[in-house]
From Swiss-Prot:
UniProt record similarity statement: Belongs to the protein N5-glutamine methyltransferase family. PrmC subfamily.
Gene from which the chain derives: prmC
Lineage: Bacteria, Fusobacteriati, Fusobacteriota, Fusobacteriia, Fusobacteriales
Keywords assigned: Methyltransferase, S-adenosyl-L-methionine, Transferase
Name this protein carries in UniProt: Release factor glutamine methyltransferase
The protein's role, per its UniProt record: Methylates the class 1 translation termination release factors RF1/PrfA and RF2/PrfB on the glutamine residue of the universally conserved GGQ motif.
UniProt: substrate binding residues: 241-244
Keyword Transferase in record: yes
GO molecular function, one term: protein-(glutamine-N5) methyltransferase activity
GO BP field: methylation; translational termination
UniProt EC number: 2.1.1.297
One Pfam entry name: PrmC_N
Catalytic activity: L-glutaminyl-[peptide chain release factor] + S-adenosyl-L-methionine = N(5)-methyl-L-glutaminyl-[peptide chain release factor] + S-adenosyl-L-homocysteine + H(+)
Binding, S-adenosyl-L-methionine: 174-178, 197, 241
């Protein structure tokens, strides 16, 4: 089994639950038949075949050097992803799969992917066509923003906020590939999540990812901010990872980002604060009185975004740092207006007198 599946025997148990392909089933049957007909052990049969480990490791190491020479960040990691994708093995078990011959067609695929990564500086996620976010697989395609690891912090905060809320209604503004919406919906099974995006291509991809992950409690709508939403419907949480890179910073981005990812998902071509202002201005109308607003922010934007939120009747609850120690998420709560305090006090007085 391990030989046919291109895995070390130690790693075989990891793949027990996956279904065998017809080619794999046929190959196993052929080996079993040959063992019986020739009265040989499998090790004897395998001994007749060449071990390609040294040759394959040489190809792998040359691939790493090729990416490194062309200035690609994380060349070892990218090479591991490329080899794993082409050889159809888990990245964590790749080293156990190097003894089998790599077919010429697979070598060609690896070369093509390496060239795209090194010479064209195409993002690895677009080359692979899939990427993992919050432990879930997501299809990736050009024209839709690639989800970053730091955005998982925003997801974690949303889950914590809504964990004790009964059947929470959540709105994700600028949902892109659906990463935030789907990850939150997957963790909060009783929730109802709506993702909105102005990009038609992003909406289509998000729906594909919803189907891929078999998530039922999430829907996606093509809408420019709140444009197509029902004003009478109120949410427990509004979350957004808006385009927050300033125009000046955008010009300094790596070619992988600047030349491939959608500009309007990265920058407002201004100071990076435009969408915080637009969302904060209207969010209160779509939130319940106990509702929350959660933003991903740039490393230097906590002070400015805090002021924007406070100017729009939100109270800052927390600012959360990312894995690098930078401010990355800001959580705010809809503040109760002064007239509402008076109403509450009057009601409390009545109740107390009773």
């Amino acid at each position: 089994m391990s030989y046919v599946l291109n895995l070390d025997r130690i790693a075989l148990y990891i793949h027990y639950e996956r279904e065998l392909s017809e080619d794999e089933k046929t190959s196993i049957k052929q080996y079993l038949k040959k063992m019986v007909e020739e009265n040989k052990t499998f090790d004897e049969l395998k001994g007749e075949k060449k071990d390609f480990k040294e040759e394959n490791l040489d190809i792998f190491n040359k691939s790493v050097e090729y990416l490194k020479k062309n200035g690609v960040p994380n060349p070892l990691l990218d090479t591991e992803y490329i080899f794993s994708d082409v050889l159809k093995v888990n990245k964590n078990t790749l080293k156990y799969s190097m003894s089998r011959e790599i077919k010429e067609e697979d070598k060609n695929k690896i070369r093509e992917m390496l060239v795209l990564r090194a010479k064209k500086r195409k993002p690895l996620q677009y080359i692979l066509g899939e990427w993992e976010f919050y432990g879930l697989p997501f299809k990736m395609s050009e024209g839709v923003l690639i989800p970053r690891a730091d955005t998982e912090i925003l997801v974690e905060q949303c889950i914590q906020l809504m964990r004790e809320v009964e059947e929470p209604n959540i709105l994700d503004i600028g949902s892109g590939s659906g990463a935030i919406s789907i990850a939150v919906a997957n963790e909060l099974k009783s929730s109802s999540v709506t993702g909105i995006d102005i990009n038609e291509k992003a909406i289509k991809l998000a729906i594909e990812n919803k189907i891929l992950n078999k998530i039922e409690n999430v829907n996606f709508i093509e809408s420019n901010l709140f444009g197509k939403l029902d004003k009478d419907f109120k949410y427990d949480l509004i979350v957004s990872n808006p385009p927050y890179i300033s125009k000046d910073e955008y010009e300094t981005l790596m070619p992988e980002v600047k030349n491939y990812e959608p500009q309007n998902a990265l920058t407002d071509l201004g100071d990076g604060l435009h969408f915080y202002k637009e969302i904060s201005k209207l969010a209160g109308e779509y939130l319940k009185d106990t509702g929350y607003l959660a933003f991903e922010i740039g490393y230097n934007q906590a002070k400015d975004v805090s002021k924007i939120l406070q100017d729009n009747n939100f109270a800052i609850l927390s600012i959360v740092k990312d894995y690098g120690g930078n401010d990355r998420v800001i959580i705010a709560k809809k503040a109760i207006k002064a007239e509402n305090f008076e109403e509450i006090e009057e009601e409390e007085d009545v109740n107390l007198s009773e």
